Amino acid sequence: IPPAKDGLLPKTFELINEDEPCAGLEEINDYFNELHISDGLPIIPPTKARYEKMLEYCPFDEDMVLCDPSGPSGKCVTVKDVAIAAVMAGCKPKAMPVLVAAFKALNNKAYNLNQSVTTSHPGGNLVLVSGPIAQEIGLSGKQGCQGPGWPVNATLGRAVNLVIMNVFRSVPGVCDLDCIASQAEFTYCFAEEPDLAEWNMINEDHYDSETTTVYVLKAEPIHDVIDFLSLNGHDLLDTITHCCSTLGSNNAYMPGPLVVCLTPDHGKMLKKDGYTKEMIQEHIHTYCYHEVPMVRNR
């Protein structure tokens, strides 16, 4: 079933079968995989009806450019590209405002988009949403939020990576130069949880509690921090700091931004011992380093 000139699949009435409603889905997925316009997981066919439904939650013109030309293809990303990927990923239309904001953020020069879509580092395109829209659409920051079982997290993050593959043509093993890649390149999306936050969330730091913000970062896969014995915030913070730049990680050699996710009990411990968010940030950025002999010739 070749796509139409506009890149969308035609309405596939010929595949409708009352005895087998999903007849043809396997063939569609095989076709997308052959063209390297899928991530290997089953996709929802981006029919015209589904595409138009997705745009109902997007007030922008479908040809509006969200990202400048980048990546191996040298193409720009439009609202249309994002809506198609959102359908394929299984997103609900309510996710469109977050996706549009995410690609506007990816277009910020500080993100270094062109390098991020071809790097050999197996990082994913982390999307962190703060504010009321996250809760309205079901985006989670609760226990297990970066694993399976959270459909909004999974599909929204997946849509971001489908756009990067399909529009920028950052195809694994071709122009995506990861050595073995990682699960973070399938999906990497979660929210700040207001009921669990011990300090202001990102949206409150920059705007207010009624505004929703979308923060993006090219980030390595989850780096677990294990500390069973610390009984005070200072010792716990030292453990966290040491994990932020372990030898062999990018941050040991090329310092960059960090996202530190605190569990509720760790957040409570740090706040109880008098730490503010700014104090935690300052501590990490002061002590997150290695002595020169440790990194020389590595």
Language-model features, listed with the residues they occupy:
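Non-transmembrane, aqueous-exposed alpha-helical and coiled segments at domain scale
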Residues: 1-298
